[in-house]
């Protein structure tokens, strides 16, 4: 895909290929820039942009990303122009209410699913901004900043929701009933304030339903990734210090590749740790990492692989 955003001629040195694995081309945000990073680690294109918690690429090559606290926009990549937008802070009956959007998803029918924190609901809208469906969310500790993190509509029409403030992943059916939920354990440790490796909690960020029916969960400030069965048994875990020379901090995005590997976001981890890590789950071998702190800072919370088809995320 050819982009005509500002061309960045500087080449990053902050990337690594471990063993024989190739690097990845991906989109990300950090240091007030939305950027595409090449497989060689160079910034191919960039544009000024604030923080994000979610990003998608549409079949037409456009990007869908959040702008500000509550607006979702579609960006035409040839010139970086916004060609469509929906503002949950002003539309859908939300004007005057505290609203934050941390997750959304383009749907196969052309509509968009949006998780609205504050109102505590999932909405599906058409491209005219008309609400087609509303799913109320169960939130034990409501707050517009923490009601949700990543939310995904599954192939069966259910919704898999990370409730950051509750420390719980809930699955809702198409009628809004909770059909499964999993409380992220504290593993016998006390909560600790902060965002980096020294913090601790259960503020889940992402959940991916695997082909085997299990759920892969990034536990945010729990510094780990866990695989949980429908019966709520943990059958696999990647802990904070399992990867040699790498410390996991606020574990964010999860991308499950067709080859079975996991690409994991490692936010707030400091300059001594990579911001993205690709891991073989069976061996816990690191096959690729991106050390993006110098270029994108300590708050690179979301990324999107652009060079691999069929990724679950």
Regions found by a protein language model. Give the residues of each.
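Histidine-/acidic-rich catalytic cores in large beta-rich domains
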Residues: 20-313
């Amino acid at each position: 895909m050819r982009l005509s955003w500002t061309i960045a001629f500087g080449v990053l040195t902050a990337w690594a290929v471990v063993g024989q694995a190739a690097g990845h081309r991906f989109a990300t945000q950090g240091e007030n820039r939305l950027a595409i990073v090449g497989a060689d680690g160079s910034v191919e294109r960039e544009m000024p942009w604030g923080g994000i918690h979610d990003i998608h690429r549409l079949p037409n090559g456009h990007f869908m990303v959040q702008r500000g606290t509550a607006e979702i926009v579609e960006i035409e990549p040839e010139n970086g122009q916004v060609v469509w937008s929906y503002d949950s802070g002003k539309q859908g009956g939300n004007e005057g209410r505290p609203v934050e959007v941390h997750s959304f998803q383009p749907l196969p029918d052309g509509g968009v699913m949006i998780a609205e924190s504050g109102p505590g609901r999932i909405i599906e809208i058409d491209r005219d901004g008309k609400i087609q469906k509303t799913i109320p969310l169960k939130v034990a500790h409501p707050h517009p900043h923490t009601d949700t993190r990543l939310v995904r509509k599954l192939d069966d029409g259910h919704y898999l929701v990370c409730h950051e403030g509750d420390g719980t992943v809930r699955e809702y059916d198409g009628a809004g009933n909770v059909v499964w939920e999993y409380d992220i354990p504290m593993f016998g440790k006390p909560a600790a304030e902060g965002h980096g490796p020294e913090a601790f909690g259960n503020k889940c960020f992402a959940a991916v339903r695997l082909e085997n029916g299990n759920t892969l969960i990034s536990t945010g400030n729990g510094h780990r990734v866990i695989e949980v069965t429908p019966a709520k048994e943990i059958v696999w875990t990647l802990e904070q210090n399992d990867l040699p020379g790498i410390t996991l901090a606020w574990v964010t995005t999860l991308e499950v590749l067709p080859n079975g590997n996991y690409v994991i976001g490692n936010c707030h981890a400091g300059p001594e740790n990579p911001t993205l890590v690709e891991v073989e789950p069976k061996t816990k071998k690191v096959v690729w990492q991106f050390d993006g702190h110098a270029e994108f800072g300590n708050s690179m919370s979301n990324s999107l692989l652009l060079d691999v088809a069929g990724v679950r995320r």
